[in-house]
């Protein structure tokens, strides 16, 4: 059953990546564009989170959970919602256009069950932390006990970790005993204007642990771990973990033959050591198999992701997942130094379409080109825990508010003093309004 589950999730991951990539391609190359200006859409940034979001939305998340999706992964989010039946074809076809699916997830403009608006980089991340604290406050007041507590999840672009409000939020979480919060860092190490500084993940790990978080580093997938267990494998592990981010990305873009040349040069020409085992490890793999192995980072490995997320559900401690990924994973843009705002060419999209057995004219079909029966995929989607209760837009009863408040009887006072007196008077009443006012400073 587990193998079948992984097979289905892998098929859905490929479909999600295709739909997201095609949505962006349609907006830039097919839809009428009188201005001639680039529409954009961040194909590479979306691709790096496709596996993580597949694991979460199709297998791990529950209806009570809430997710802040990093802004540039909105095409992946919309594709997932489309497969769930909670996004329309028309909205996808008008992505980044009038009345279309939004560039960045928007709770007010999108129709597909967005939990947090994340267009302002970094703010959605911190909002999940404070939402978790509010959930605890509501529970402490005895409200909402008829519903299970949810996890507040942020999917974070690694460059978002430059935003100062995130670090301020971490301190607040520590002060108030933060629980049930997951932050998943999409650690692809490439952004618009830089490559992430070497070793930054160790600083993240130390910082989060200092604030009481568990830290799970998802660096290697199962294929890599299996290779490390082979003779010569530990030397391959050491090379991967010491490889500079810029070099790893460049070799990813160049492909299997480039990987082979570099690995053989670096690992098999060292004096004073028998190079047989590590040479054999490399040479028994084809170029394609070697490229697949080197791309099998933890953030692209479904078994590793599922295990990590499901383990984290067994407790309520906050968890930071540092998921190593490749920007543009699964696309010809993978690893390219300029892929942040890059777009696949019509020729590249045609090759991808053919490789996925998607017929021309059927690009939007939900199950076109899938290797598993449509009824199997439909059944799996229908049974996904996340959508068990449909869309999750909830309402609460309106709290009565008096038309006017009694003005404090003082000959003169500051506005701060007056506001404090008003709050004091409200607090003395036995009303729903008094019970629900929260003051902050």
Question: Can you describe what each PLM-predicted range is?
Answer:
Residues 4-16, 20, 24-34, 43-176, ...:
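Cofactor-binding active-site loop characterized by glycine-rich and histidine/acidic residues
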Residues 11-18, 65-66, 371-441:
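Non-catalytic terminal/interface segments that mediate subunit docking, oligomerization
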Residues 65-67, 150-152, 181, 317-325, ...:
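Generic beta-sheet signal
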Residues 67-70, 180-188, 440:
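Short internal beta-strands
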Residues 72, 323-326, 441:
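Short, well-ordered beta-to-alpha junction loops that form the rim of enzyme active sites
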Residues 156-159, 185-186, 323:
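Active-site flanking residues adjacent to catalytic metal/cofactor-binding acidic residues
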Residues 160-164, 296-306, 412-420, 424:
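Active-site glycine- and acidic-residue-rich loops that bind
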Residues 187-408:
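Long, well-ordered, tryptophan-enriched scaffold segments
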């Amino acid at each position: 059953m587990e193998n079948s589950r992984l097979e289905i999730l892998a098929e859905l991951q490929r479909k999600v990546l295709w739909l997201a990539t095609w949505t962006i391609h349609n907006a830039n190359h097919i839809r009428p564009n009188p201005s001639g200006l680039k529409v954009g859409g961040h194909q590479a940034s979306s691709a790096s989170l496709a596996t993580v979001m597949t694991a979460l939305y199709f297998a791990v998340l529950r209806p009570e959970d809430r997710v802040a999706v990093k802004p540039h992964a909105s095409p992946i989010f919309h594709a997932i919602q489309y497969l769930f039946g909670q996004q329309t074809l028309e909205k996808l076809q008008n992505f980044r256009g009038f009345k279309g699916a939004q560039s960045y997830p928007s709770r007010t403009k999108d129709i597909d069950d967005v939990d947090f608006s994340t267009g302002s980089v970094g703010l959605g991340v911190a909002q999940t932390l404070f939402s978790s604290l509010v959930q605890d406050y509501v529970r402490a007041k005895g409200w909402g006990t008829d519903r299970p507590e949810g996890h507040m999840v942020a999917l974070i672009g690694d460059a978002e970790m430059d935003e100062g409000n995130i670090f301020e939020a971490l301190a607040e979480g520590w002060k108030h005993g933060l629980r049930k919060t997951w932050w998943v860092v999409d650690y692809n190490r490439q952004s618009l204007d830089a490559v992430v500084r070497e070793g930054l993940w160790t600083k993240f790990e130390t910082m989060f642990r200092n604030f009481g978080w568990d830290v799970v580093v998802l660096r290697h997938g199962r294929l890599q771990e299996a290779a490390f267990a082979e003779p010569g494998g530990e030397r391959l592990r050491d090379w991967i973990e010491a490889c500079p981010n810029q070099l790893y990305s460049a070799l990813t873009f160049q492909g299997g033959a480039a990987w082979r040349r570099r690995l053989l040069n670096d690992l098999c020409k060292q004096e004073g050591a028998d190079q047989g085992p590590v040479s054999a490890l490399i040479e028994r793999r084809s170029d394609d198999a070697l490229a697949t192995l080197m791309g099998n980072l933890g953030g692209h490995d479904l078994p590793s992701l599922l295990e990590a997320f499901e383990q984290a559900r067994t407790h309520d401690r906050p968890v930071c997942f540092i998921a190593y990924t490749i920007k543009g994973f699964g696309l010809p843009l993978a690893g390219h130094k300029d892929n942040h705002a890059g777009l696949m060419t019509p020729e590249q999209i045609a090759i991808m379409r053919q490789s996925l057995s998607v017929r021309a004219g059927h690009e939007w079909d939900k199950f076109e080109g899938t290797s598993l029966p449509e009824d199997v995929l439909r059944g799996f989607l229908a049974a996904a825990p996340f959508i068990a209760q449909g869309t999750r837009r909830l309402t609460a009863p309106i709290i009565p508010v008096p038309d006017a408040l009694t003005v404090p009887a003082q000959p003169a006072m500051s506005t701060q003093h007056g506001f404090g007196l008003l709050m004091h008077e409200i607090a003395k009443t036995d009303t729903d309004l008094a019970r629900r006012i929260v003051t902050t400073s």
